[in-house]
Amino acid sequence: FYKMPRDCFTVGEGIDGLLGNLVRLFIEPGDTVVSSLGAYPTFKYHVDGFGGNISLVPYNNNYEDLDALLSATKKSKAKILYLSNPDNPMGTFHSKERIQDFIDNIPDKTILCLDEAYSDFVDVNELAPIDIERENVIRFRTFSKAYGLAGLRIGYGIGNKKLVEAFNKVRNHFGVNRLGQIAARVALEDQKYLQVVLKKVDKSKKDIAAIFKKFGFTSLASRTNFVPINSGGDGNFAAKLMTGLIQEKIFVRMPSVSPLNSFIRIT
């Protein structure tokens, strides 16, 4: 599918499992990692569990702040730098040129963990090319989002052979079940259906944004499968809005920290 050597791939129990393996490989008590304040929390759970210190950089206008992340990484000599693109939880997206420049400026001794769980919702030509010669970048992708196989827990990492081989030292060798493997293979072979799903998701996002617009709410241009809606208030107001929607059987989430928590998310 990617036309890359098999030994440049590692498979795990979703990206969550792979994040755990990455931290287990490289983080010892007292080591520093860098992420964004309000970013996907599971990475922080793993870092805390292995005794690492996590430096959290605030978002800049609903985007992860690439310049500030680089600065924090260099200043702290971080072992791992975590970035999601498209972003979770805000759905924003950095261009391939911006990401490539970001990658080119990562210190050699820092591992960049590029979480691309939502990359299937972006045209492949909009993504920075995968360079398997670069030894300090691992890109994580999943079958949980666009492919709809979240319950089967299939995630995978793409990177340099040497980096990928290291995962064999710590991974759960029986963690990926056979049913999940079969489903993932079949899903990859049915790209026509994936395109149908992507078109339906895009239409649904536009419909959801239009409904909220009628009531005076604005939304972000999301490059994921969810719509971030600006509540127009603070986190407490957004929480009340979320609770009301949940009571109407509309499943809604919201970011956990200010100022991101003025938004709610509808998938």
Which positions does each model-derived feature cover?
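Conserved beta-loop-alpha segment that forms the PLP phosphate-binding cup at the N-terminus of a helix
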Residues: 6-30, 155
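Active-site pre-lysine segment of PLP-dependent enzymes
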Residues: 48, 66-76, 89-149
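PLP-dependent enzyme catalytic core of the Aspartate aminotransferase-like
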Residues: 97, 101, 240, 244-253, ...
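PLP-dependent aminotransferase class I/II
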Residues: 136-213, 217-220
